[in-house]
Amino acid sequence: MIDSTTELRPLTKRQQQIYDLIKAKIQDTGMPPTRAEIANFFGFKSANAAEEHLKALAKKGYIEMLAGTSRGIRLVEEMLEAEGLPLIGRVAAGEPILAQEHIEEHYKMDGNLFHPAADYLLRVNGESMKDIGILDGDLLAVHQTTEVQNGQVVVARVENDVTVKRFKREGNVVYLHAENEDFSPIKVDLANQEFNIEGIAVGIIRSGRWM
């Protein structure tokens, strides 16, 4: 069974080409290609050669092969997207924010409801951003990116801690401002401290309603 815990292994050049062809065919026609169509496209001598490449893609976790049909190919990424947005709870020090152990569940929502599209939801912990309506327990919709402008609300990692704050950069210093007068800004010296942007806030979900 293939699920969201599947660890994808790198593809060979030919495997990547076949994977890209499958995606393109699905986007253009709504259907994956047959083995014969794959063989014809790449000049293989038989459909069996295409079958072997498909088996390799399935073994590496990129597709699922369905028995009994010539077009029995399903992209795993589409299956995972159908689960909804991953909801991230507490993030362990030093671990990637989307590490499987951080995902509490998948929230049945289309990320394209937000602009730019949300890639995951982060459960808000604390009241440091309450003055702009981001409250403890809210689900913050986050677009995963490392590109950020001054004034944007970001999910940032300072050393091993993940925080939601308003971003401002001045030279080699970043200030992460709370939206609550009880909290002082976090000053980050980029020359001496580890700092990463995990994404920008694009919306809030509270009690099942997006805002």
UniProtKB/Swiss-Prot annotation:
Q: Which domain of life is it from?
A: Bacteria
Q: Which family does it belong to?
A: Belongs to the peptidase S24 family.
Instruction: State the active site.
Output: S128, K165
Q: What does this protein do?
A: Represses a number of genes involved in the response to DNA damage (SOS response), including recA and lexA. In the presence of single-stranded DNA, RecA interacts with LexA causing an autocatalytic cleavage which disrupts the DNA-binding part of LexA, leading to derepression of the SOS regulon and eventually DNA repair.
SUPFAM superfamilies in the record: LexA/Signal peptidase, Winged helix' DNA-binding domain
What GO MF terms are annotated? DNA binding; serine-type endopeptidase activity
Reaction(s) catalysed by this chain's protein: Hydrolysis of Ala-|-Gly bond in repressor LexA
Tell me the enzyme class.
hydrolase
Organism expressing this protein natively:
Colwellia psychrerythraea (strain 34H / ATCC BAA-681) (Vibrio psychroerythus)
- What binding partners and quaternary form does the record give? Homodimer.
Task: List UniProt keywords, sorted A-Z.
Answer: Autocatalytic cleavage, DNA damage, DNA repair, DNA replication, DNA-binding, Hydrolase, Repressor, SOS response, Transcription, Transcription regulation
Q: Which protein are we looking at?
A: LexA repressor
Q: Does the keyword Lyase apply?
A: no
Q: What is its EC number?
A: 3.4.21.88
Instruction: Report which gene this protein is encoded by.
Output: lexA
